[in-house]
């Protein structure tokens, strides 16, 4: 089932579902509850009921790319297990139904005022202490005092743009019109505080391509990175409007909501931006349009130094922009949703996005190669591996992500620098990869030097015992000098106890000089006020003891 209409949800006051609070952002119920008929009920505008218990109307964004997402037709509309909520409208306000008319609601049979009056009965005496009732009365009093004006909301129009009311001239005056200026105050609720962070009302992400963030396809609704990707610095960079620089790299800006109530949500405050693993994408704007920056100006972007026109001109004159504009508009197209059958087999349902016209970046190629190899689609991977730069990056990313299958395939198919790969595996502490690479022909002396400078005592010990036919002074000296350079006192102790007979006084003095240079470097370039060189001092003392042993052994 394909479906592109805007869907709506009706909520009560307080907003709850199955006795659990719901609100702005990501809301989810368990699949178990969903199967029991306790999911979220959604309506098309043309099927909004005349009588339904509720206070608020909520346009919803469906997180269709969530693997747990379930969506099906029901006798009353649609039924799902997760929704993302942002805007909020009062059902006691006729303007809400005028807005719904533009989405397909028929007001011929029952006028907007009559429908609003029908819903207003829920503001009964037993709710006089409720937030909804107080909010309703405050808006009614403000209107009667002449402090408010009506605003009409066009479908898909930016919430930042005001336009004239088109209330019918023959409509009844029921005496309590609630203005949408003040409803915006209610809907622009600040994000739920997360770990003590006070988040701005509006946050944004910037992308080069319309449906792609980095190498990841994105769409309207919930978009997630895995925790592994997040830890590899592949999460979303989320900006406050005031921190958007003049020459940021990108062509589209998306307003986002942070699903702070999601159990797997992660957020880091990095001073000038936020770093997170999931966002809910709402609206999309072109950075080549001055109106985009005027909207951002309302959320804190400074337009005094560079005007909206000057900022937009940077992107309008960009060559890639001319290509991208041919397939874009101000707002995201409606998402196409796929039906999830009653078996709920965790089928992934995603919005339809095509990237066939988007040139593949190096990162995209690398990501695709990893996926092809994991799926045993080796021919597809081989075509992309012909580029040397791509090949090198595939090796690097495979080692850093501990992807042994990719490394095995690359060793079988290509000639690459085993020694560099071993060095990177040790630097990244990927010992499984290191042990696999050791099975092939490699430079043992170079590997021993790397293990010594990085402090891998077990590897040094095994190599000295098994990988060399004969231990000599040159080999021991390589270990000693590299251990001194890396400040690895345990390796120096190892040499002093097992191979002291191969060490000369000159070798020790050279190692001492290396450690003294290390101390000088630490004291000169360290940013810490409390400089710790205790390990280096212990090494110098150990070298003095070693010199005494070497000198005395000659007599």
Curated annotation (Swiss-Prot):
InterPro entries: Ankyrin_rpt-contain_sf
Coiled-coil residue windows: none
SUPFAM superfamilies listed in its UniProt record: Ankyrin repeat
Start-end of each ANK repeat: 364-389, 390-420, 422-447, 455-488
Keywords: ANK repeat, Repeat
Protein name as catalogued: Putative ankyrin repeat protein L283
The organism of origin for this protein: Acanthamoeba polyphaga mimivirus
């Amino acid at each position: 089932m394909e479906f592109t209409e805007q869907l709506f949800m009706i909520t009560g006051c307080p907003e709850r579902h199955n006795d659990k609070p719901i609100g702005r952002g990501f809301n989810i119920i368990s699949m178990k509850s969903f199967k029991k008929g306790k999911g979220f009920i959604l309506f098309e505008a043309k099927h909004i009921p005349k009588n339904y218990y509720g206070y608020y109307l909520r346009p919803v964004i469906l997180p269709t790319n969530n693997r747990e997402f379930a969506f099906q037709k029901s006798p009353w509309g649609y039924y799902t297990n997760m929704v993302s909520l942002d805007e909020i409208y009062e059902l006691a306000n006729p303007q809400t139904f005028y807005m719904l008319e533009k989405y397909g609601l028929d007001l011929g049979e029952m006028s907007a005022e009559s429908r609003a009056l029908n819903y207003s009965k829920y503001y009964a005496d037993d709710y006089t202490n409720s937030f909804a009732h107080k909010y309703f009365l405050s808006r009614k009093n403000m209107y009667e005092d002449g402090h408010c004006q009506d605003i009409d909301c066009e479908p898909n129009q930016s919430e930042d743009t005001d336009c004239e009311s088109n209330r019918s001239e023959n409509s009844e005056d029921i005496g309590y019109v609630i203005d949408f200026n003040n409803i915006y105050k209610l809907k622009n609720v600040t994000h739920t505080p997360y770990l003590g962070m006070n988040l701005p009302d509006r946050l944004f992400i910037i992308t080069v391509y319309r449906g792609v963030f980095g190498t990841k396809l994105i769409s309207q609704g919930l978009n997630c990175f895995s925790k592994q990707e997040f830890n590899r610095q592949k999460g979303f960079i989320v900006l406050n409007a005031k921190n958007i620089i003049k020459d940021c790299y990108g062509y589209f800006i998306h307003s986002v909501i942070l699903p702070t109530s999601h159990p797997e949500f992660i957020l880091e405050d990095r001073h000038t931006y936020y770093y997170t693993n999931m966002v809910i994408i709402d609206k999309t704007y072109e950075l080549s349009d001055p109106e985009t920056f005027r909207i951002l100006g309302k959320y804190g972007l400074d337009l005094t130094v560079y005007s909206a026109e000057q900022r937009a001109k940077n992107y309008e004159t960009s060559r890639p922009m001319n290509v991208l504009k041919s397939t874009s508009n101000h707002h995201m197209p409606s998402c196409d949703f796929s039906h999830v059958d009653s078996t709920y087999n965790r089928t992934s349902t995603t919005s339809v996005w095509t990237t066939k016209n988007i040139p593949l970046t190096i990162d995209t190629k690398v990501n695709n190669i990893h996926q092809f190899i994991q799926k045993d689609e080796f021919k597809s991977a081989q075509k992309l591996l012909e580029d040397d730069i791509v090949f090198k990056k595939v090796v690097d990313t495979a080692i850093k992500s501990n992807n042994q299958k990719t490394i095995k395939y690359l060793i079988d198919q290509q000639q690459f620098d085993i020694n560099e790969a071993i060095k990177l595996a040790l630097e990244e502490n990927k010992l499984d990869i290191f042990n696999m690479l050791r099975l092939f022909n490699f430079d043992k002396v170079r590997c021993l030097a790397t293990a010594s400078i990085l402090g891998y005592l077990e590897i040094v010990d095994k190599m000295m015992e098994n990988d060399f036919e004969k231990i000599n002074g040159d080999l021991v000296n390589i270990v000693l000098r590299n251990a001194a350079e890396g400040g690895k006192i345990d390796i120096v102790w190892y040499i002093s106890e097992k191979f002291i007979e191969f060490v000369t006084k000159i070798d020790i003095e050279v190692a001492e000089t290396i450690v003294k240079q290390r101390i000088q470097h630490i004291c000169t370039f360290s940013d810490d006020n409390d400089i710790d060189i205790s390990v280096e001092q212990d090494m110098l003392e150990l070298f003095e003891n070693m010199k005494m042993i070497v000198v005395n052994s000659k007599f």
